[in-house]
């Protein structure tokens, strides 16, 4: 019998620190908000890990029949340094350009990197600078509830007042008294009642470029406010999933919860999902430590974008992932393997149509529908268990090996089961976010002829073999032995033997 296919989706909820069965607010629909980048510099692969993980989560939810509304913001104003200066404005001063030029440059760069990694576009990608009016309205609501105060043109969230009715620090489980004793006094904080109060609105001096009019004077919104405002606008005051990197738990997400409770009296999201960090030589990858790795550099070094995506998914999202060259090399090989498996499915289809498998391989074991259903269930169950991508990839490798057995004529399959096998493989490859077209285009023209020429027309197989052999001869003539050996080995897998005369 096929394996049990009725397991629920279990999600680790950072709010409760345990796995919980996922139950959406509205059956069949999922509202998800993921904190996007602050666009003051190029995103490195440690930043990109979060967005690749949530891309897979969205793909899986959609494969399970959910209609997902995915919101991912762009922070183009309001992310403050410890000295109270906006990060984007600070970078603009260094480069002597307009702040929005910095924001636009790195927003475009971020989107291009996610395109290369085959990430789906969010349904809405709001800019913080495009929601100033709504953020001012949020501040007014918090003030009206008594949880914020104005001080010399700035507005701060009153954590002491908030603590009388709610718990602050639910996600990080930070002890507020420890925070108070360990918070250093900064010049920019002198107007606060308490050093741990956070800014909802910051007064801007006359030289500040990124500023807007407000009831409290010219200024700009605080970083934490934008996500509360925009998630509420596009998903409502209570939605299903809020995601982001683990480093956002405190203070950003704790502050979001506080703001939402101050305005609406309830937490914004039912499930909080946090991705862990990427390290390099066991040290956190960050701009401040100078050990960042850029996607463009890795691609220029010869790694497939698919491979980088596979690497970022190779560890469970809640685990620390350490970068090393061997792991990336292995991911590169695996990307090639999955593409070869896709190609092999086409070969099997051609051979079935020509009756070659039935004639030559009729005494070999026949893979059954139940076996294929079990493979499908194993892949699905891996992701039902808190999006366990290492297990999911492992099951896909098993599936790939099964297809290898068929193409190597160690296992037989009928046409109906082949169609189902192809459906399974393509479905899970899509959930993985594997970009077949991108992988194909990265092969050289010679490699394409060698790898894919046979699948187009069995009727002209002799002509195609002649062309492929000519390509191989030209490769040998210019001492391109990697390509010539590649062609020989690939043809050998198809049952064709090439003997070199020299």
Give the predicted meaning of each segment.
Residues 1-40, 55, 112, 133-347:
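Alpha-helical recognition segments enriched in aromatics with Gly/Pro capping
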Residues 71-77, 105-110, 120-135, 153-162:
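Short, glycine/charge-rich beta-strand/loop segments that flank catalytic centers
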Residues 292-502:
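Structural preference for alpha-helix termini/caps and helix-kink/transition segments
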Residues 92-98, 123-129, 245:
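The substrate-binding groove and active-site-proximal loops of carbohydrate-active enzymes
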Residues 16-19, 25-118, 138, 498-500:
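N-terminal, positively charged nucleic-acid-binding surface of large information/translation enzymes
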């Amino acid at each position: 019998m096929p394996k049990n296919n009725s397991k629920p989706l279990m999600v680790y909820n950072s709010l409760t620190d345990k796995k919980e069965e996922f139950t959406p607010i509205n059956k069949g629909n999922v509202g998800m908000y993921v904190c996007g980048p602050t666009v003051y510099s190029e995103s490195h692969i440690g930043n990109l890990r979060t967005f690749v993980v949530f891309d897979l989560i969205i793909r899986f939810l959609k494969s399970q029949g959910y209609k997902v509304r995915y919101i991912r913001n762009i922070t183009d104003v309001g992310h403050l340094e410890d000295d109270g200066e906006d990060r984007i404005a600070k970078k603009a001063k260094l480069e002597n350009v307009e702040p929005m030029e910095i924001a636009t440059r790195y927003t475009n760069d971020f989107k291009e990197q996610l395109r290369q990694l085959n990430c789906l576009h969010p349904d809405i990608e709001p800019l913080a600078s495009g929601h100033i009016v709504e953020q001012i309205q949020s501040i007014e609501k918090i003030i009206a509830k008594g949880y914020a105060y104005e001080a010399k043109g700035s507005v701060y969230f009153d954590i002491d007042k908030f603590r009388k009715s709610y718990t602050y620090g639910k996600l990080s489980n930070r002890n507020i008294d420890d925070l108070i004793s360990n918070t250093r006094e900064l010049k920019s904080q002198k107007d606060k009642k308490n050093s741990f109060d956070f800014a909802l609105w910051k007064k801007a001096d006359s030289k500040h470029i990124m500023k807007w009019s407000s009831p409290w004077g010219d200024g700009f919104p605080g970083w934490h406010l934008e996500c509360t405002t925009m998630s509420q606008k596009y998903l409502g005051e209570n939605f299903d999933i809020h995601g982001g990197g683990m480093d956002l738990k405190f203070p950003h997400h704790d502050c979001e919860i506080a703001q939402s409770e101050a305005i609406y009296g309830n937490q914004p999201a039912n499930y909080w999902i946090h991705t862990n960090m990427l390290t390099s030589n066991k040290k956190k990858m960050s701009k401040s430590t100078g050990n960042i790795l850029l996607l463009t550099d890795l691609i220029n070094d010869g790694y497939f974008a698919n491979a980088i995506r596979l690497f970022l998914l190779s560890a469970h999202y809640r685990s620390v992932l350490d970068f090393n060259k061997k792991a990336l090399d292995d991911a590169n090989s695996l990307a090639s393997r999955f593409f070869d498996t896709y190609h092999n499915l086409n070969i099997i289809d051609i051979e079935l149509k020509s009756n070659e498998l039935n004639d030559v391989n009729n005494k070999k074991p026949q893979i059954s529908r139940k076996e294929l259903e079990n493979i499908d269930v194993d892949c699905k169950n891996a992701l039902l268990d808190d999006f366990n991508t290492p297990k999911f990839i492992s099951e896909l490798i098993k599936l790939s090996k099964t297809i290898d057995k068929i193409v190597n004529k160690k296992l037989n399959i009928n046409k109906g089961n082949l169609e189902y096998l192809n459906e399974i493989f393509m479905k899970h490859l899509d959930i993985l976010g594997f970009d077949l077209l991108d992988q194909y285009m990265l092969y050289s023209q010679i490699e394409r002829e060698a790898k894919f020429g046979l699948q187009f027309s069995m009727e002209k197989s002799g002509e195609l073999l002649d062309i492929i052999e000519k390509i191989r001869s030209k490769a040998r003539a210019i001492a391109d032995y990697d390509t010539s050996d590649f062609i020989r080995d690939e043809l050998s897998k198809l049952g064709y033997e090439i003997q070199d005369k020299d």
